[in-house]
């Protein structure tokens, strides 16, 4: 809806000094770790609280493009400071399964935890991947790799929130 309003404003008043950024699945330090937040923040909480295993919905095969919140903030700042007025998708450009994400978090936690897949629960969309061609052409590339960003987020949770 916001994009349509901005386009209408452009047509009516000729003003096009705005940018729209459509981020992929964002995660990072200031996420909602209550268990009702994103899949990553909820998984971090589950792993931290687990002693032997965690339950995960579906079979772990859905693919996501996870992007670190700090990289999204940097992209917004670059669009603003470089006066780039456009609409872009912003993602890491890396296809990661839910299973890979959970296994990476377990590795980071250094806890001997197994995953119990509950196939009676839904997988969700099988693939959510953005076309980041325009983002790449502008030179807006995420700085942190997925695993490093997960480490920062996990460390924040255990060292700052608990």
Regions found by a protein language model. Give the residues of each.
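Active-site Tyr-X1-5-Lys
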Residues: 1-22, 44-51
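Flexible, glycine-rich beta-alpha linker
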Residues: 16, 21-40, 63
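C-terminal substrate-binding subdomain of Rossmann-fold SDR/epimerase-dehydratase oxidoreductases
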Residues: 49-162
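Structured catalytic cores of enzymes that bind and process phosphorylated ligands/cofactors
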Residues: 1-5, 28-32, 122
């Amino acid at each position: 809806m916001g994009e349509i309003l901005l386009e209408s404003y452009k047509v009516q008043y000729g003003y096009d000094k705005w940018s729209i950024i459509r981020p992929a699945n964002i995660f990072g330090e200031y996420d909602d770790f209550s268990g009702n937040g994103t899949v990553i923040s909820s998984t971090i909480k589950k792993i931290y609280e687990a002693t032997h295993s965690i339950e995960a919905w579906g079979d772990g095969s859905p693919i996501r493009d996870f992007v670190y919140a700090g990289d999204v903030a940097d992209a917004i700042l670059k669009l603003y400071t470089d006066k780039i007025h456009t609409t872009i998708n912003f993602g890491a450009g890396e296809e990661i399964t839910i299973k890979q994400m959970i296994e990476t978090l377990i590795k980071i936690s250094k806890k001997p935890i197994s995953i119990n897949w509950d196939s009676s629960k839904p997988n969700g969309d099988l693939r959510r991947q953005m076309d980041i061609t325009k983002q790449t052409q502008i030179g807006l590339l995420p700085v942190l790799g997925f695993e490093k960003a997960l480490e920062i987020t996990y460390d924040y949770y255990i060292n700052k929130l608990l």
